[in-house]
UniProtKB/Swiss-Prot annotation:
UniProt KW keywords: Amino-acid biosynthesis, Branched-chain amino acid biosynthesis, Chloroplast, Leucine biosynthesis, Lyase, Plastid, Transit peptide
Protein name (database record): 3-isopropylmalate dehydratase small subunit 2
GO cellular component, one term: chloroplast stroma
GO biological process, one term: glucosinolate biosynthetic process
Family from the record: Belongs to the LeuD family.
Disruption phenotype: No visible phenotype under normal growth conditions.
First-tier enzyme category under EC: lyase
Any one Gene Ontology molecular-function term assigned to this protein's record: 2-(omega-methylthio)alkylmalate dehydratase activity
C-alpha cells in the first residue's frame, strides 16, 4: 500500500496553536493520521540552503533540483547491516547520547558515533567501529516493528549522520516512520518478504525505487526482493525532510 502524506496549509501564524482542518487523512498499514495529528517534530529545524548558517542536508536527501519524477530513479548501493525484530530506539541510540539535537556537522558526527551502539552483545559485528563516526554499511535490513520504543527523533538522525541511506524492514513503529519522513534522514522502506532472514551483514545490495514500489538486489546471493511503494512520503524524504519539502513547494516561506 502506498503512503500518502497530508497536504499543508499555505501559511500558519507562528503564534497559532490550532491545528489546520485542511490536513488530509494519512493512511498506511501501520498508522493513521488525521487533521489533529502533526508530522513535524517540534525540536527539528532545517535551515535554508541559501543562508550563511550551518546547513545540515540529510544523507537520504537528493539535490534541490530533483522532483517527484526523479524519485523513480533513486538508487542506493552498498553493504547491508542485518538486524531482526523489535529494534527499539534505545538500541539505535542510547538515551544518554540523545541529550541534544544536532545543529551543526560536529554535533552530527558526535551523534553518529553512537548509531546502533545499544545493540545487545551478541551482535558481534559493530555498525560503527570504536572511534569512528561513519559506518561502512549504507543500508540497514530489519524485521518487524523497527524503531519501536521512545519517540526520540534522534534515532533516524543518528543513522543518517552515520551514513545510512535506507532501511528495509517488514514493518515500522509509527513514530519512527514519521520521524524518518519528517527529518529526511533515511528512507524507511517495506519489504514484501522477510529479507532479514535472506541477507547477511556485509552482503552487497542495491535498492532501486520506482513509483510502484522498489527492488532490492542482493549481489552476493544473486536474489531479488520486491519492496512496497513509499508513496508521497518519498518526495518529502528526497527533498530533505518535511520543512525543506514545504519550502520547496512554496507551502511555507523560505528562510532566504
Amino acid at each position: 500500500m502506498a503512503y500518502s502524506l497530508p497536504t499543508f496549509p499555505q501559511a500558519l501564524p507562528c503564534s497559532s496553536t490550532k491545528t489546520s482542518s485542511s490536513l488530509a487523512t494519512f493512511r498506511s498499514p501501520f498508522l493513521r493520521f488525521n487533521g489533529s495529528t502533526s508530522l513535524i517534530p517540534s525540536s527539528i529545524s532545517i535551515t535554508s540552503r541559501g543562508t550563511s548558517s550551518p546547513t545540515i542536508i540529510p544523507r537520504a536527501a537528493a539535490s534541490e533540483s530533483d522532483s517527484n519524477e526523479a524519485l523513480a530513479n533513486t538508487t542506493f548501493h552498498g553493504l547491508c547491516y542485518v538486524l531482526k525484530d523489535n529494534i527499539d530506539t534505545d538500541q539505535i541510540i542510547p538515551a544518554g547520547a540523545a541529550c541534544t539535537f544536532p545543529s551543526n556537522q560536529q554535533e552530527r558526527d558526535e551523534i553518529a558515533a553512537h548509531a546502533l551502539s545499544g545493540l545487545p552483545d551478541f551482535h558481534k559485528t559493530r555498525f560503527i567501529e570504536p572511534g569512528e563516526n561513519r559506518s561502512k554499511y549504507s543500508i540497514i535490513i530489519g524485521g518487524e516493528n523497527f524503531g519501536c520504543g521512545s519517540s526520540r527523533e534522534h534515532a533516524p538522525v543518528c543513522l543518517g549522520a552515520a551514513g545510512a541511506k535506507a532501511i528495509v524492514a517488514e514493518s515500522y513503529a509509527r513514530i519512527f516512520f514519521r520521524n524518518s519522513v519528517a527529518t529526511g534522514e533515511v528512507f524507511p522502506l517495506e519489504s514484501e518478504v522477510r529479507v532479514c532472514e535472506e541477507c547477511k551483514t556485509g552482503d552487497t545490495v542495491t535498492i532501486e525505487l520506482s513509483d510502484s514500489g522498489g527492488l532490492l538486489t542482493n549481489h552476493t546471493t544473486g536474489k531479488n526482493y520486491k519492496l512496497k511503494s513509499i508513496g508521497d512520503a518519498g518526495p518529502v524524504i528526497d527533498a530533505g525532510g518535511i520543512f525543506a519539502y514545504a519550502r520547496m513547494m512554496g507551502m511555507i516561506p523560505s528562510l532566504a
